[in-house]
């Protein structure tokens, strides 16, 4: 376009010679633009340094559920080599998009390959190399379709197996789950077997005798047949645990038994927990024992105190009786003035201190006797106070008379 404008300007300069300066300026501008555009045109031309920078390709998958294995490597959108090959061998068959394959049914996947491989352009039918390449591509497509069908079957089997992930197909024996509590053995008679069927059956706990009865009645219903076959497989072998090296023998319960009555009419007894006693608990036994010990200790203490207090009361009575006897003896000693019997000072003072009534009577009874004697023997008192010693009878009688007079004055 700009070349045509340049030619028009040159013709105008020829027609109008007065405007030659403006035409020369336009010619210079056009030459500069050509000089700038020529390197870009050289880079686009074919040559040894020509390289097409295509998009980075993703790593090819070995197989896929949707599209299957790839039959040929994808080519870039445009390249000179592809154009040359298209000129030499005719148009190249393009790959179908993945989105269109994904929405087609699986039954048509097998028919896509041969049909695509058999449809050849007329140019390809004329040339023998193109025919050989087409037959090879058709064989590759059919092989890919067969492999794709096998992968689809394997995928179906895999999805079918995921529904029974808790079931072991090696022997038809169910595996124990981790949520169940492993109870201890409950004996040979009450041994229980547990089965966990996947799906809608739910966990069931049946005894060995009941499993044998169900094996006999397999011809009644289909459900009874399925449960009986599974039960017979389990009763013949051993119940497999989660670990392959740990196996539970037949007759040992691995799950909590049900409390519903069995078909025999006998209630199934629950398993016994280790360490559990049938009677009282441990803390109750300890409480009862401590209370009995305290009661026995209280009884023993009461008996000991009674035995200790009985002799002490007897001794108190004896001491009181002894004091009364001493008082009577003291009263008799005050009225008896024989020289052979001389009361001691302890007996006299204890008698007067204990009971004043006895002392008053004793003193009043003895006053006339001592009064008469003191009237006749005044000199003897003086002699005794002067230091002259008297006889033994006077020496014993004077203190008694003196003490009795003084006590009589004090008390009366």
Curated annotation (Swiss-Prot):
One of its GO terms (molecular function) is protein domain specific binding. Residues 1-43 form the signal peptide. Coiled coil: none annotated. The keyword Nuclease does not apply. It is a single-pass type I membrane protein. Residues 121-146, 248-263 have a biased composition (Low complexity). GO terms for biological process: cell adhesion; negative regulation of cell-matrix adhesion; negative regulation of wound healing; regulation of polarized epithelial cell differentiation. Keywords: Cell adhesion, Cell junction, Cell membrane, Membrane, Signal, Transmembrane, Transmembrane helix. Residues 44-284 are extracellular. The chain crosses the membrane at residues 285-305. It is found in: Basolateral cell membrane; Apical cell membrane; Cell junction, Adherens junction. Residues 306-412 are cytoplasmic. Pfam families: AJAP1_PANP_C. Residues 62-175, 243-271 are annotated as: Disordered. Residues 160-171 have a biased composition (Basic and acidic residues). Residues 305-412 are annotated as: Targeting signals. The keyword Lipid metabolism does not apply. PANTHER family: ADHERENS JUNCTION-ASSOCIATED PROTEIN 1. Plays a role in cell adhesion and cell migration. Forms a complex with CDH1 and CTNNB1; interacts directly with CTNNB1. Interacts with AP1M2 and isoform 2 of BSG/CD147. This is Adherens junction-associated protein 1. The lineage of its organism: Eukaryota, Metazoa, Chordata, Craniata, Vertebrata. The gene is Ajap1.
